[in-house]
């Protein structure tokens, strides 16, 4: 049986691991290192360099060297080299191909199967892009696994049978995740996860670069940001300085011949950076890790004191300020020192590959979806079908209905996020279900099913229960999330919770009022068109019609309290209408049956009180 590898496809560095005799082994690359820089360069002679060789020539080949491409996964980003455009998936595939070659050289056999990790907070488009990168690299991607989950799997499997709660704090080169997991008796279950897809070691490096640029400009008057080669040298020096400050109180940044002055005289950069200053200029970055931590503890429904172990993942967790913050957040709990933060994710991925291949027995991995999923319904409301932190794989269905009479089709718009208003979330994709037979609004029943597979990739189906017609979409389009979108998604939901609540309440009230107006109007019309004349007194019908007119006027405005008031009045008058027809029927016949009150309709027990917006979003 072909071997399967576990791959940690990182922003700055990547690692590949494989099971040997049931134990995971990290594979050294052809340069002899256990980590491979996620850097790709296109040499001018046509050669494609990957890893350390690409990183080594970056200064002299700035425009043709790509780093940190993981931050562009799931977006429409591309780079043009020699007239050809390369997507983020293609660049990532180059890194995966090198890892694949190195693993094949180590094992002496071909590798086709792999488990690849992604940040827990990656959205659907980003996960799909990662899978595509694997396919481009010639790999059969068995599973996409969340990085903190893989780390917990590597850490927790040999910790005995007692159930334990583990916090994984994962700060890598470009992404940040925090997850709470329970491990016991071979089961690894994710309780909650949160994070920031645009926070990582690169951001700390950038602060040092900016600090050096400002210092140099202050002494020489020259702005180094206009010199690409100088900036590449600064980036490399900043990374080294950051690493040195993890073990020393100060570091020197000495870059001779960094640029020349107006007289073509060479200039040197020589600065001393102390740890305290480094921590001062990066404090706000560190503070951005607090909210996801607090969110995870809250979502998991536990107290900090219930956390048994803290596992640090990612090279950026070596910074003393990060370690100190984690200790502060966990009430003084010392992080576990028994795992290599650079390698533990790949080790966990290899173990999961072993589980899928049957090499590792009696292990069950239960992961979660990091963000809620739903569709847009009438009023622009986000109707969630799957809540965040739901264990995957999972499948949920809800039945919706049409917004207009004789509506021939419905537009299903799929969103991911936590906001109450759909447009404030991430649009993953949309599709149309056509061929709905003519019928009054509220009669057709459209069943929408969300299916998330074990990779966290979403499939959505819409089916007309009446005709059996259905349409399915595998969410794979989408532009990915911008820097602002992803880290604001949950934070905005909390910051704007009150605003969202009011808008949702307004949408709900409008929907209820419109439905009542429609049903009452229809009932009055039927009474007036009765063959033998209506048994309801004319003044009662006129009174109800006046109430309908008032409700319509209120719906034309923006005063939600006026709509509520008009709806209450119409409801009372409608009840009087029902009472009048009941009394008239009783008087006419002793054997009388029950007549439908306004609003009566066929049983819709399974129908959610929301309506799918057709095509264009209705203006509010």
Curated annotation (Swiss-Prot):
The keyword Signal does not apply. The modification Phosphothreonine is found at residue 175. Keywords: ATP-binding, Chaperone, Nucleotide-binding, Phosphoprotein, Stress response. Residues 588-620 are annotated as: Disordered. GO terms for molecular function: ATP binding; ATP-dependent protein folding chaperone; unfolded protein binding. Induction: By stress conditions e.g. heat shock. Residues 606-620 have a biased composition (Acidic residues). PANTHER family: HEAT SHOCK PROTEIN 70KDA. Acts as a chaperone. HAMAP family: DnaK. Belongs to the heat shock protein 70 family. This is Chaperone protein DnaK. The gene is dnaK.
